[in-house]
């Protein structure tokens, strides 16, 4: 008799476990469908529109071939080839301390140029970068499984100087792979390589950027806007970073182009205002028009965005379940 009851209790627990797993699978599938629907615009599906490069790793490689001897950072006297070499050395150093491709790496706090080099070194390995901003590493480790912490005892330049500038890639990330996990918002924002590339491409088209343009931008290191406008944009467009006599400036205020986060006032933005929605990677509209392959609707209490720059989702699927609706992503004011 005891055996009978134990058997049926175990059988019931097994059925409950299988049922919960099945429901979880259905929810995951439903959320993925919602996110994919939000990332489509018209009949153009995400990744169907080809960006010039298939990943951030390929971006740095391709731009170095195009602009190898061109100055990339006049402040630090660094050419595109110098930058590329630093990135390769960084990847070799990361590999030497046990970092593996596909891992998530928590970015340490570094100054702008070192952060930019480390970020591309992480991408070059096929890893994803975590920006914790005001969150403690302990807090991140509680929420992210197997997040790797990188610590430096001296400057990045001193740390990597003995490593080879030839790096053999063990993993080449796909456009759809995660490139960034940012905790700029408590819920955690996931961005793919495609998100980053398509958003920067949209900014380039909207502003009409030309290579060799002297450019300056001074944003908070580690913010999503810093990643897009200060870390990637100069590399993507072949710009020259210069704070003495820039031809183009981008910043929070008083610049040629100003970043505006107050989306409830988007209808009143000036022609040189860039509407920022970090759930849409960064740029949403410039000069009153949505950037290429992005669109939005104004709601009473927020904005619904859709298009190829729409993020991979929040870290928490329960939030995704609510936020992704009606073939879009709702962001509250």
Residue ranges and their predicted role:
Residues 74-77, 92-134, 214-224:
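Conserved AMP-binding/adenylate-forming
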Residues 197-214, 220-257, 262, 270:
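Conserved AMP-binding/adenylation subdomain of ANL enzymes
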Residues 237-240, 247-307:
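Gly/Ser/Thr-rich phosphate-binding loop
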Residues 2-96, 149, 161-179:
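N-lobe entry segment of adenylate-forming
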Residues 106-108, 115, 119, 123-161, ...:
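Short beta-strand->loop structural element characteristic of the AMP-binding/adenylate-forming
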Residues 29, 33-34, 65, 69-70, ...:
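Conserved pre-ATP/AMP-binding loop-to-beta segment of ANL
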Residues 304-333:
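Conserved ATP-binding/catalytic segment of the ANL
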């Amino acid at each position: 008799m005891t055996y009978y009851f134990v058997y049926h209790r175990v059988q019931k627990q097994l059925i409950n476990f299988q049922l919960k797993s099945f429901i979880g699978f259905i929810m995951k599938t439903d959320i993925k469908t919602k996110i994919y629907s939000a990332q489509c615009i018209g009949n153009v599906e995400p990744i169907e529109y080809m960006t010039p490069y298939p990943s951030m790793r390929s971006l740095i490689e391709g731009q170095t071939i195009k602009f190898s001897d061109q100055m990339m950072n006049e402040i630090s006297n660094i050419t595109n080839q110098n930058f590329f070499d630093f990135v390769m050395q960084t990847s070799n150093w990361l590999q030497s301390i046990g970092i593996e491709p596909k891992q998530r790496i928590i970015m340490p706090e570094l100054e702008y140029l070192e952060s930019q080099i480390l970020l591309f070194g992480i991408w070059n390995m096929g890893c994803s970068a975590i920006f914790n901003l005001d969150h403690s590493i302990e807090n991140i480790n509680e929420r992210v499984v197997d997040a790797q912490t990188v610590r430096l005892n001296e400057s990045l330049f001193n740390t990597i100087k003995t490593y080879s500038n030839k790096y053999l890639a063990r993993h080449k990330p796909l456009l759809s792979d995660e490139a960034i996990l940012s905790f700029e918002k408590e819920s955690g924002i996931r961005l793919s390589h495609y998100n980053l590339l398509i958003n920067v491409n949209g900014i380039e088209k909207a502003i009409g950027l030309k290579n060799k343009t002297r450019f300056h931008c001074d944003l908070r290191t580690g913010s999503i806007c810093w990643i897009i406008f200060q870390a990637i944009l100069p590399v993507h467009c072949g710009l020259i970073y210069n704070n003495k006599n820039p031809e183009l400036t981008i910043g929070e205020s008083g610049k040629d182009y100003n970043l505006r986060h107050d989306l409830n006032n988007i209808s009143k933005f000036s022609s040189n205002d860039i509407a920022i929605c970090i759930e849409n990677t960064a740029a949403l509209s410039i000069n009153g028009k949505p950037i290429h392959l992005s669109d939005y609707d104004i709601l009473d209490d927020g904005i619904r965005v859709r298009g190829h720059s729409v993020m991979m989702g929040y870290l928490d699927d329960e939030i995704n379940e609510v936020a992704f609706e009606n073939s879009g992503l709702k962001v509250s004011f």
